[in-house]
């Protein structure tokens, strides 16, 4: 059996069964409840397919027990564990940027993001800011625009996880 799968990628295992008794029809079933992301298809010709696409919440080990039964009730069992490996998911911004500032009034926006990968550490940066804005350790950009700053300004904010997954927010 194929015992490794990767998050977000289709897992497929072709099942081929046989019986020494000629003419016996074989039925392939799961002897245990399959993980929600897995589907067992019995093709009706002594073959079947175990397939599915695991998601982030499926990372880890999953016990599978398959059973093939002939017309006489005789059966055989195949047991194995499928280990689903994590794929890095990029962080996403959960805060909505404030895109308008008022002349001579303080502007402040704190970036907030999340990452579905457990344990990922996030790093916030502001690689493109106008001169009147500053970025601090609390992931906040702030400043007070003057009359000289009236107009549109490109602002680019980034959040990166420790596996180089990145999200960008442009204001």
Language-model segments: what does each one mean?
Residues 1-27, 76, 80, 89-123, ...:
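Extracellular ectodomain surface segments
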Residues 38, 88-92, 130-133:
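Proline-centered linker/hinge motifs at extracellular inter-domain junctions
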Residues 62, 74-80, 153, 165-171:
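Extracellular and select intracellular beta-sandwich modules with Ser/Thr-enriched
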Residues 49-59, 140-150:
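Extracellular/luminal low-complexity segments enriched in Ser/Thr/Pro
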Residues 10, 59-63, 106, 150-154:
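Extracellular Ig-like/FN3 beta-sandwich strand-entry sites
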């Amino acid at each position: 059996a194929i015992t490794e799968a990767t998050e977000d990628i289709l897992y497929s295992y072709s099942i081929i069964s046989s019986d020494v008794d000629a003419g016996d029809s074989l039925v392939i079933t799961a002897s245990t409840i399959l993980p929600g992301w897995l589907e067992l298809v019995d093709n009706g010709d002594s073959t079947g397919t175990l397939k599915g696409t695991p998601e982030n919440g499926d990372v880890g080990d999953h016990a599978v027990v398959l059973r093939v039964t002939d017309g006489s009730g005789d059966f055989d069992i195949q047991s194995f564990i499928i280990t689903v490996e994590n794929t890095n998911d990029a962080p996403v911004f959960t805060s909505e940027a404030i895109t308008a500032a008022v002349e001579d009034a303080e502007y402040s926006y704190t970036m907030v993001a999340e990452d579905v990968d457990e344990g990922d550490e996030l790093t916030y940066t502001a690689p493109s800011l106008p001169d009147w804005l500053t970025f601090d350790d609390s992931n906040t950009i702030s400043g007070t625009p003057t009359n000289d700053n009236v107009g549109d300004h490109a602002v680019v904010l980034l959040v990166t996880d420790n596996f180089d997954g990145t999200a960008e927010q442009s204001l």
